[in-house]
UniProtKB/Swiss-Prot annotation:
Details of cofactor binding: Binds two Mg(2+) per subunit. The magnesium ions form salt bridges with both the protein and the DNA. Can also accept other divalent metal cations, such as Mn(2+) or Ca(2+).
The protein's enzyme class: isomerase
Cross-link named Glycyl lysine isopeptide (Lys-Gly) (interchain with G-Cter in SUMO2), sites: 17, 156-157, 261, 352, 386, 397, 416, 418, 425, 440, 466, 480, 529, 584, 599, 614, 622, 625, 632, 639, 655, 662, 676, 1075, 1114, 1196, 1204, 1228, 1240, 1259, 1276, 1283, 1286, 1363, 1367, 1373, 1387, 1424, 1444, 1456, 1461, 1486, 1494
Binding residues annotated for ATP, in chain numbering: 91, 120, 148-150, 161-168, 376-378
Comp. bias (Acidic residues): 1099-1108
Subcellular location: Cytoplasm; Nucleus, Nucleoplasm; Nucleus; Nucleus, Nucleolus
Organism lineage: Eukaryota, Metazoa, Chordata, Craniata, Vertebrata
Residues that bind Mg(2+) 2: 541, 543
Modified residues (Phosphothreonine): 282, 1205, 1244, 1327, 1343, 1472
Active-site annotation: 805
Organism: Sus scrofa (Pig)
Comp. bias intervals (Polar residues): 7-16
Protein name from the UniProt record: DNA topoisomerase 2-alpha
Gene that encodes the chain: TOP2A
Site (Transition state stabilizer): 804
Family as reported in the entry's similarity comment: Belongs to the type II topoisomerase family.
Length: 1533
């Protein structure tokens, strides 16, 4: 077809036209891109900025349905429409805040006519013209944008309206919007209607009005803007729920919906709408906890099973997403619940705060000032808590109810579930033929296969036992037997934490190897087929620890899979304990009682060779094969016999059955004691015919032996205060009787060899080290000497050197405390047929009180503090004299703090602190067992650097300690020091701890556990037993001396008759000779006869006969009954010489005299002799210790000057003002409360230390000094009250604090230790520390002069002119001793007037020098105004020689010490003295009644002549002496 010539022209025209249009569009787009809209247009164009989305959304919401009520379901609604309705509704509710008289809101929702109306009878809107805007106020605020009454932020409002948009937005999104309001105040009614999205305003109607105010908003939502046809069911259900919200959250307002009143009476009944028909896991209705906290806050709480849920309102706005108001309340509840859950879930899965919150459903209704939200939709309140304008502190009642409403149980169930999930991850649900990752497992070849039920897993005690089992598998084969070694004891899963179980490799390995699954029930045979092994065989040593391992494995299976025990799933493999052989005969015994029975029924048992098997490692591979070849004899099955088996297993391992366990063990001990008395053999399990065992029998006959031995190892004996390990050490040292020091490591080897010690040598070395320690807080009397670094108070003994480098030997006091003469009266034990240590030693004083004791066994624990040696000795003397013993306070050697009694068996221990100036304090003593380094790290460092929770308190501290003394100089600001003083420096700096002695449990002399209520009960028990044993000793000595005397008499007569020729022995037959001797009336060897009569194997020590004698005995004793005259016929010829004859006669006469002397003595006399010898040696030892301490101190050895300043820095400052620790009423009340309240776990756990107790003010304390209540006790080193004292506060049964009482009492009949003159100083106190780990300390007491703090009463006089300090007065010849004083005497002493000669007398300390059993008058200083004091005294004793003077440090006798301070309430303190007249007078007046402080020199006696003679001298007062106390640390193992 041809193309018309016009065609191209048209096409070109069209192209040009298109180009022009595109260019026009480009020009227009600039204007379109950058447009300006009015606010009304903007709201309609972008509604989501103002009212939220105008699109339909579907989500889960709380709605109200007619047939169901409030429920949580999926709804489809338009958020924008919901919001405009809500704005009008909240405005109506806000009106209640403006007008409290408002009482009604009427809501009408008419879906058919698309009409919503909200009416309230609150105060109407002012119907008045706005002078600025020139229009009526209702028209202004409903028809003009950006208008509001809420723009004044200075005004605190609790309304929902905030930004001035709400009602206008409703107007804009409505086709018709009518406001009608009436104001009685302005007497007008206003009505106006807007149409077309607020685009067109109708005529305003104004009418006169005289009725009640009201406001009514009626609107027709513009459904087209929300893409809706009508108000559907879902949006109506949501709006109805909001009407209910308003009814619940607005107080005292009735809400009507469509003419019907809503059945809601306040917030609590509103909450019920949500929880109606809701039940917890057990089917019970949910408990609701409600509290009206105040007029602005109302809270309800219940349990939630769907995570954290909250329904909350802020000023009637439903904050569906919560906000800070919800967090504020929820966090308070969570914090309390977390604590409760942690307590109840000890050891379970760790629970965090958000996990606790997930179990809570909280309802909050709050009025908050000027709240802020994160959007105009107001779903999340963002205002900070500090701006709320009110607080919501939930009451204790609410919290208590919250704990009991089911939330805690729900959390704990969730914890168990989570734990189970975690545990199940450790198990395999599928049976595997091969297991990887357990290298030490020798798997049975058939394990995990078809025949797995026939397989047995042998669990052995350690690798060596595995080797034995593997040797035996050569006999039975490897197809059906697997072997896995256990590393020691497995966990007690019944009491273990979830974390422990999860991380315990041993348990996880057993589960993996056997194929066990948690929570699976293995009732039937099919379930057993899912396991890799059908049985577990336990193969442990036949000792008590082996029994414990068996018990723990039984407990493990029983706790998790009790059904397995019914299938005979467990069995044990037993091996012999003893084998006897003769020729080719061999017998094996599987229990010692069975062996003993065999011995008693076999007359010639000594001809058999006996071999003891200590563990599986003793058996050879050959023997292992023999055992496995006779599997029937060695395999013992555990048989389930019923509920009594379950009960027995729980009894042994459940924490809840502590009391039952005590009863169980007590019954066992009583039964064993009765059997011994009746001569019956012990019960045993493994006889020749035993093939099975019930769990009940195993627990009650085998495992109980472990529990009992655990107690024996952990709890010392009342008699000697020692545990078996310590007794073995002492036995070995006595036997070795080393004259030279020996290495600790070597001694440990020796102990293991000589005393048959079967445990690790490391623990033995620690026992030796602990027996030798003598730092403050360890031993008061160390039985071994610490030669080398045995540990110090810096680290609590943990800084001891390696046992390879340190040496020890017996203390010179040891054999005086444990006299060899008593050894014959003791019952020695036998182990492996070897004679080892005795059942107990019998010291001359109760060592359990001197060095304290501590240990935790099964069912019981023991905690006894240290007491002062001299106080104990004095009390023993009182008991011997038939008098009542004096009360004692704990005392630790060389401790300078105080120990005060709070209540019976409860004490408070305080360190020492002094104020140097307004910004500096000095800490010169820490509570007992608060170690210097620990204190620095845990108290001072956090105070210096601050922690996350606490700001720094101090600005700096300096350290001036030595290994024996403490000195921290602490700097802080004036304000903080003043505040700390107000609170109490001891409390702030944690210088007070508490000591409770409520678990004084010890083995008595018959081996039964006994709980003592007081220390004096222990003392009386010991006294009776010891006196009885002195009687036994006398009896034995009389027999022995009689026999020796007869022997010497016979020998002397024989020699004399031979010389006279009356007897001829030359060339005569032996038989004839014996006949002649009998005829002439000679006795058969009297000593030998006497020993045989004792029916004792002669002790190795006493049987030191020469080899010749032994040989002679052998040849002589043809018949046991024949007479023995070797003692005569074996005498050497040179006995016939004159010299030897005379010597023999002299010996005979001396022995006879010795015998006569002994006969005249009573057991008490023997005891007193021992005590006197011991005290004398104690003085010498302490003098030497003091001398050693003084080496290098200024003033010693003539080279003092260079070191003087350097040494002074370690001593307490002389100008410090001592802070007296206070015991507050609260502390006493707390102590009383503890007494009334039985401590639940009295037997297993220690009560916490009470640190930081508040103390009384200094002033009150000083006033009290003069006049104390008679009932209270306080420990002072200078005095010891003698009146009856209140019992002291309980200390935690397991707590360790021990303190050693300062000792020389005025009642003491023991020569006091030497004491040096002191510098004016304040009283120092004894502090007891709470956790000493060991039971012994034998440190000798040392006196220290360097550590006293001057008394706060006269700091300015702390140093007087040094003129006379260096002059050493002659040793005083005599010292009065004070004895038998009543506490009341203290009150009678009136201080002398300042003018009295005594007052001018330079510090002279009266030393009380007691002498046993004698009361002598004390010479008192004749001060003019001094009242008479009771005078009692003792023999005077000369000062020890060689004491050196120390001008600066009052080190010696030569200085005149100040008199002790007056006795106050019973308190253990180091003695101190003041130069000030007043204090001096007080001391003088008190001197007689007060006990002499520990360490006080025997040579300082206040004597009239001396006092007068020296008063002219103004000697410089000495620095106070510090007493370092030691506490025992022995049972770390």
């Amino acid at each position: 077809m041809e193309v018309s010539p016009l065609q191209p022209v048209n096409e070109n025209m069209q192209v040009n036209k298109t180009k022009k249009n595109e260019e026009a569009k480009k020009r227009l787009s600039i204007e379109r891109i950058y447009q300006k809209k009015t606010q009304l247009e903007h709201i309609l164009l972008r509604p989501d900025t103002y009212i939220g989305s105008v699109e339909s959304v579907t989500q889960q919401m709380w709605v109200y349905d007619e047939d169901i009520g409030i429920n949580y379901r999926e709804v489809t609604f338009v958020p924008g429409l919901y919001k405009i309705f809500d704005e009008i509704l909240v405005n109506a509710a806000d009106n209640k805040q403006r007008d409290p008289k408002m009482s009604c809101i009427r809501v009408t929702i008419d879906p058919e006519n698309n009409l919503i109306s909200i009416w309230n009878n609150g105060k109407g809107i002012p119907v008045v013209e706005h002078k600025v805007e020139k229009m009526y106020v209702p028209a202004l605020i409903f028809g003009q944008l950006l208008t509001s009454s809420n723009y004044d932020d200075e005004e605190k409002k609790v309304t929902g309206g905030r930004n001035g948009y709400g009602a206008k937005l409703c107007n804009i999104f409505s086709t018709k919007f009518t406001v009608e309001t009436a104001s009685r105040e302005y007497k007008k009614m206003f009505k106006q209607t807007w149409m077309d999205n607020m685009g067109r305003a109708g005529e305003m109607e104004l009418k006169p009005f005289n009725g009640e105010d009201y406001t009514c908003i009626t609107f027709h939502p513009d459904l087209s803007k929300f893409k809706m046809q009508s108000l559907d069911k879902d949006i109506v259900a949501l709006m109805v729920r909001r009407a209910y919200d308003i009814a619940g959250s607005t107080k005292d307002v009735k809400v009507f919906l469509n003419g019907n009143k809503l059945p809601v009476k306040g917030f609590r009944s509103y909450v019920d709408l949500y929880l109606k028909d809701k039940v917890d896991e057990t089917g019970n209705p949910l408990k609701i906890i409600h509290e009206q906290v105040n007029h602005r806050w109302e809270v309800c709480l219940t349990m939630s099973e769907k995570g954290f849920q909250q329904i909350s309102f802020v000023n009637s706005i439903a904050t569906s997403k919560g906000g800070r108001h919800v967090d504020y309340v929820a966090d308070q509840i969570v914090a309390k619940l977390v604590d409760v859950v942690k307590k109840k879930n000890k050891g379970g899965v760790a629970v965090k705060a958000h996990q606790v919150k997930n179990h809570m459903w909280i309802f909050v209704n709050a009025l908050i000032e000027n709240p802020t939200f994160d959007s105009q939709t107001k779903e999340n309140m963002t205002l900070q808590v500090k701006s709320f304008g009110s607080t919501c502190q939930l009451s204790e009642k609410f919290i208590k109810a919250a704990i009991g409403c089911g939330i805690v149980e729900s959390i704990l169930n969730w914890v168990k579930f989570k734990a189970q999930v975690q545990l199940n991850k450790k198990c395999s649900a599928v049976k595997h033929n091969r297991i990887k990752g357990i290298p030490k497992l020798d798997d049975a070849n058939d394990a995990g296969g078809r025949n797995s039920t026939e397989c047995t897993l042998i669990l052995t005690e350690g690798d060596s036992a595995k080797t034995l089992a593997v040797s035996g598998l050569g006999v039975v084969g490897r197809d059906k037997y697997g072997v896995f070694p256990l590393r020691g004891k497995i966990l007690n899963v019944r009491e273990a934490s979830h974390k422990q179980i999860m991380e315990n490799a041993e348990i996880n390995n057993i589960i993996k190897i056997v194929g066990l699954q948690y929570k699976k029930n293995y009732e039937d045979e099919d379930s057993l087929k899912t396991l890799r092994y059908g049985k577990i065989m336990i193969m442990t040593d036949q000792d008590q620890d082996g029994s414990h391992i068996k018990g723990l494995l039984i407990n493990f299976i029983h706790h998790n899979w009790p059904s397995l025990l019914r299938h005979r799933f467990l069995e044990e493999f037993i091996t012999p304990i003893v084998k006897v052989s003769k020729n080719k005969q061999e017998m094996a015994f599987y229990s010692l009682p069975e062996f003993e029975e065999w011995k008693s029924s076999t007359p010639n048992h000594k001809k058999w060779k006996v071999k003891y098997y200590k563990g599986l490692g003793t058996s050879t591979s050959k023997e292992a094969k023999e055992y496995f070849a006779d599997m029937k004899r060695h395999r013992i099955q555990f048989k389930y016999s019923g509920p009594e088996d379950d009960a027995a297993i729980s009894l042994a391992f459940s924490k809840k059955q502590i009391d039952d366990r005590k009863e169980w063990l007590t019954h066992f001990m009583e039964d064993r004691r009765q059997r011994k008395l009746l001569g019956l053999p012990e019960d045993y399990l493994y006889g020749q015919t035993t093939t099975y065992l019930t769990y009940n029998d195993f627990i009650n006959k085998e495992l109980i032996l472990f529990s009992n031995s655990d107690n024996e190892r952990s709890i010392p004996s009342m008699v000697d205060g020692l545990k078996p390990g310590q007794r073995k050490v002492l036995f070995t040292c006595f036997k070795r009787n080393d004259k030279r020091e020996v290495k600790v490591a070597q001694l440990a080897g020796s102990v293991a060899e000589m005393s048959s010690y079967h445990h690790g040598e490391m623990s033995l070395m620690m026992t030796i080290i602990n027996l030798a320690q003598n730092f403050v807080g360890s031993n008061n009397l160390n039985l071994l000497q610490p030669i080398g670094q045995f540990g110090t108070r810096l680290h609590g003994g943990k800084d001891s050197a390696s046992p390879r480098y340190i040496f020890t030997m017996l203390s010179p006091l040891a054999r005086l405390l444990f006299p060899p003469k008593d050894d014959h009266t003791l019952k020695f034990l036998y182990d492996d047929n070897q004679r080892v240590e005795p059942e107990w030693y019998i010291p001359i004083i109760p060592m359990v009180l001197i060095n304290g004791a501590e240990g935790i066994g099964t069912g019981w624990s023991c905690k006894i503090p240290n007491f002062d040696v001299r106080e104990v000795v004095n009390n023993i003397r009182l008991l011997m004299d038939g008098e009542e013993p004096l009360p004692m306070l704990p005392s630790y050697k060389n401790f300078k703090g105080t120990i005060e009694e709070l209540a019976p068996n409860q004490y408070v221990i305080s360190g020492e602190v002094a104020i140097l100036n307004s910004t500096t304090i000095e800490i010169s003593e820490l509570p007992i067992r608060t170690w210097t380094q620990t204190y620095k790290e845990q108290v001072l460092e956090p105070m210096l650097n601050g922690t996350e929770k606490t700001p720094p308190l101090i600005t700096d501290y300096r350290e001036y300690h030595t290994d024996t003394t403490v000195k921290f100089v602490v700097k802080m600001t004036e304000e903080k020091l003043a505040e700390a003083e107000r609170v109490g420096l001891h409390k702030v700096f944690k210088l007070q701890t508490s000591l409770t002695c409520n678990s004084m449990v010890l083995f008595d002399h018959v081996g039964c556990l006994k709980k003592y209520d007081t220390v004096l009960d222990i003392l009386r028990d010991f006294f009776e037993l010891r006196l009885k044993y002195y009687g036994l000793r006398k009896e034995w000595l009389l027999g022995m001396l009689g026999a020796e005397s007869a022997k010497l008499n016979n020998q002397a007569r024989f020699i004399l008759e031979k010389i006279d020729g009356k007897i001829i022995i030359e060339n005569k037959p032996k038989k004839e000779l014996i006949k002649v001797l009998i005829q002439r009336g000679y006795d058969s060897d009297p000593v030998k006869a006497w020993k045989e009569a004792q029916q004792k194997v002669p002790d190795e020590e006493e049987n030191e006969e020469s080899d010749n004698e032994k040989e002679a005995d052998k040849s002589d004793s043809v018949a046991d009954s024949g007479p023995t005259f070797n003692y005569l016929l074996d005498m050497p010829l040179w006995y016939l010489t004159k010299e030897k004859k005379d010597e023999l006669c002299k010996l005979r006469n001396e022995k006879e005299q010795e015998l006569e002397t002994l006969k005249r003595k009573s057991p008490s006399d023997l005891w007193k002799e021992d005590l006197a010898a011991f005290i004398e040696e104690l003085e010498a030892v302490e003098a030497k210790e003091k001398q050693d301490e003084q080496i290098g101190l200024p003033g010693k050895g003539g080279k003092a000057k260079g070191k003087k300043t350097q040494m002074a820095e370690v001593l307490p400052s002389p100008c410090g003002k001592r802070v007296i620790p206070r015991v507050t009423v609260e502390m006493k009340a707390e102590a009383e409360k503890k007494i009334k309240k039985k401590i639940k776990s009295e037997n297993t756990e220690g009560s916490p230390q009470e640190d930081g107790m508040e103390v009384e003010g200094l002033k009150q304390r000083l006033e009290k000094k003069q006049k104390r209540e008679p009932g209270t006790k306080t420990k002072k080193q200078t005095t010891l009250p003698f009146k009856p004292i209140k019992k002291a506060k309980k200390r935690n049964p397991w707590s360790d604090s021990e303190s050693d009482i300062s000792s020389d009492e005025s009642n003491f009949n023991v020569p006091p230790r030497e004491k040096e003159p002191r510098r004016a100083a304040a009283k120092t106190k004894f502090t007891v520390d709470l956790d000493s780990d060991e039971d012994f300390s034998d440190a000798d007491e040392k006196t220290r002069d360097e550590d006293f703090v001057p008394s706060d009463t006269s700091p300015q006089k702390a140093e007087t002119s040094p003129k006379h300090t260096n002059k050493e007065p002659k040793p005083q010849k005599s010292t009065p001793s004070v004895s038998d004083f009543d506490a009341d005497d203290a009150k009678d002493n009136v201080p002398p007037s300042p003018s009295s000669p005594v007052a001018d007398f330079p510090a002279v300390t009266e030393t009380i020098k007691p002498v046993s059993k004698k009361n002598v008058t004390v010479k008192k200083t004749a001060a003019k105004s001094q009242s008479s004091t009771s005078t009692t005294g003792a023999k005077k004793r000369a000062a020890p020689k060689g004491a050196k003077k120390d001008p600066d440090l009052d080190s010696d006798v030569s200085k005149k010490p100040n008199p002790p301070k007056p006795k106050g309430r019973r308190k253990r303190k180091p003695s101190t003295s003041d130069d000030s007249d007043s204090n001096f007078e007080k001391m003088i007046s008190k001197a007689v009644t007060s006990k002499k402080p520990k360490g006080e020199s025997d040579d300082f006696h206040l004597d009239l002549d001396l006092a007068v003679a020296s008063r002219a001298k103004s000697g410089r007062t000495k620095k106070p002496i510090k007493y370092l106390e030691e506490s025992d640390e022995d049972d770390l193992f």
